[in-house]
């Protein structure tokens, strides 16, 4: 079976590169250095216009944990409504309770809204912060999600490979388990081999130098670890390489 790649794209431009490299679908977000947050309406609109492969929109209103206030929950619903209007094929969600369990009532409402519009739903890496991942697996399946994005409860998917393999076995085809987190052309073959996953998630990004001629290097506008003159973007070449390496040892 061919291994497919979902690219975590931090902009419409990255989504275009993902498609050019052969990705099967895109998870569109912003602020990857914070783990990803909901992309702007403009990013969604332009990506939808320019990219033909399925567009999955991350619904995460802020960085940090996945315990949301009432206002934050209303923001998530409003963003979902816009995704429906924009013609996006899918959304990526995840809300937890304070005790580390899945917030089933809120997630159920989001899934109902999405499914009514014919959307595919992925439960994102909030799953990795659950107190009991196997109970969370059953909860997410019962809610009607189509896919779980997970690093196996570790920082990277390769570190969590054994847990991912257990989750895939436990899921038994009831839901797609998609490894993500630090996936690259250098570890994807091992990840596929160890887990048995058939779909992989990666940003496949590179750092691109700004085209600015004048550069004021005496000021940092954003976070201290960001360089205003370096930009992260998905690389079509890296997308191709990851797909090739993922499938290199697969039977014809």
Predicted feature locations:
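Active-site mouth loops of central-metabolism enzymes
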Residues: 1-11, 59-77, 96, 121-133
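Hydrophobic faces of well-ordered beta-strands that scaffold small-molecule active sites
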Residues: 3-7, 26-28, 55-59, 91-93, ...
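Active-site-adjacent beta->alpha loops and helix N-cap segments on the catalytic face
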Residues: 13, 32-56, 71-74, 95-115, ...
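Catalytic cores of alpha/beta
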Residues: 13-20, 67-79, 128-143, 167-169, ...
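Glycine-enriched alpha-helix->loop->beta-strand junction motifs that scaffold or abut catalytic
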Residues: 20-26, 51-54, 87-90, 116-118, ...
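Glycine-rich phosphate-binding active-site loops on the catalytic face of alpha/beta enzymes
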Residues: 25-37, 82, 86-98, 145-158, ...
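Histidine/lysine/aspartate-rich catalytic loop segments that bind and position anionic ligands
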Residues: 118-158
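C-terminal alpha-helical cap/extension of soluble enzyme domains
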Residues: 171-252
